[in-house]
A protein has these predicted regions:
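C-terminal-of-GTPase-core extension/linker across diverse P-loop GTPases
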Residues: 2-8, 13, 19, 146-354, ...
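Short capping/connector residues at structural and topological boundaries
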Residues: 6, 34, 39-42, 49-51, ...
Length: 367
């Protein structure tokens, strides 16, 4: 599935350094505002130990991990919603993303200029959030002007419903609250999503801490501020050190593990960020396995077997007959598909089956 998270934040908070680490690419990461002029998109592999275990069992000719896309979006500044800095085109770039990774500076460094000259995570978060709120308010007000008359004069059911949803959202935005803070039922939420509002998108606050705070971010007062804000908003918060992550991304796997061990941590901040993005977007993984290939596929929780088959090839969904399914935890226990069959662990599932995280599937189809 082509889903992506946009990396946003004020200039010089570490967005491009983080992006370099995520993709092991080398976009410009200069020490001045707006080093990123066009959004850079990059694909990152999703590290999943289940893939490694499946490879050790099937010894395939080819291995393909699941992927996730991140987009580095230029630094926003106060007034961006009114065209300041690089303005509305970058707010438009965020609209194309499924989730927002909001990078917040949580380190002191006199050599890296802060756009407001001081490090203040609370102020920085408020600056970005207000710009997104102001941009959404403009969208909502324009839409209200189109449906208000119809809702009040014709009493058309859909127009009334849309006006009520927009009014709820506008009230929140007027109070400087994001659209995601509004309580909406399933139908109302579906309607709200059609406006592609920035503040309706799920958010991960990425606290970019110093090298000294990497192993124990909870000791960093700046991180604690970001965590407190995230908890209050029911958002996610992931501490990282972009400089260390960029360094780790260039190391061979064994050296990376040794470096992590020397730092006193078990996984990279980037792995945590990717897995948090997965969870935030309600994503899971199924597998296709065999001697030719072991591949991980991303799907949205709640998708049926035919829909998941369609992520492999559209013909698989059109001509879907059934899927032979077993869990990867069972293959890890029984070691071979033959042993799974003898134990009755391979199921035949039809069109209504909802795929589960960790399913291994063989699709039967006819076109």
């Amino acid at each position: 599935m082509a889903l992506q998270a946009g990396i946003v934040g004020l200039p010089n908070v570490g967005k491009s350094t983080l992006f370099n680490a995520i993709t092991s690419s080398h976009v410009e990461a200069a020490n001045y505002p707006f080093a990123t002029i066009n959004p850079n998109s990059g694909i990152v592999e999703v590290n999943d130990e289940r893939v490694d275990k499946l490879v050790s069992l099937f010894h395939p000719k080819k291995t393909v991990k699941a992927t996730f896309e991140f987009t580095d979006i230029a630094g926003l500044v106060k007034g961006a919603s009114k065209g300041e800095g690089l303005g509305n085109q970058f707010l438009g770039n965020i609209r194309q993303c499924d989730a927002i990774c909001h990078v917040v500076r949580c380190f002191e460094n006199s050599e890296i200029i802060h756009v407001d000259n001081t490090v203040d995570p609370r102020r920085d978060i408020e600056t970005i959030n207000l710009e997104l709120i102001f941009a959404d308010l403009e969208t909502v007000v324009k839409r209200i002007s189109k449906v208000e008359t119809k809702a009040h004069t014709t009493k058309e059911k859909e127009a009334v419903k849309e006006f009520n949803v927009l009014s709820k959202i506008k009230k929140a935005l007027d109070n400087e609250l994001p659209a995601r803070s509004v309580e909406l039922d399933e139908d109302e939420l579906l309607l709200a999503k059609s406006y592609n509002l920035l503040t309706l998108k799920p958010v991960i606050y990425v606290a970019n801490v110093s090298e000294e705070d990497y192993a124990s971010p909870s000791s960093c007062s700046y991180y604690q501020i970001v965590k407190e804000i995230a908890d209050r908003e029911h958002a996610e918060c992931v501490p990282i050190c972009a400089n260390i992550e960029e360094e780790l991304s260039s190391l061979p796997e064994q050296e990376k593990l040794e470096y992590l061990e020397s730092l006193g941590v078990s996984s990279t901040g980037l792995d945590r960020l990717v897995h948090t993005s997965y969870r935030l977007l309600n994503l899971s993984t199924f597998f296709t396995v065999g001697e030719d290939e072991v591949r991980a596929w991303t799907f949205k929780n709640g998708m049926s077997a035919p829909q998941c088959a369609g992520t492999i090839h559209t013909d698989f969904e059109k001509g879907f007959i059934r899927a032979e399914v077993y869990s990867c935890s069972d293959i890890f226990e029984y070691k071979t598909e033959k042993a799974l069959r003898e134990a009755g662990k391979i199921r035949s599932e039809g069109k209504t089956y909802l795929v589960k995280d960790g399913d291994c599937m063989l699709i039967r189809f006819n076109v």
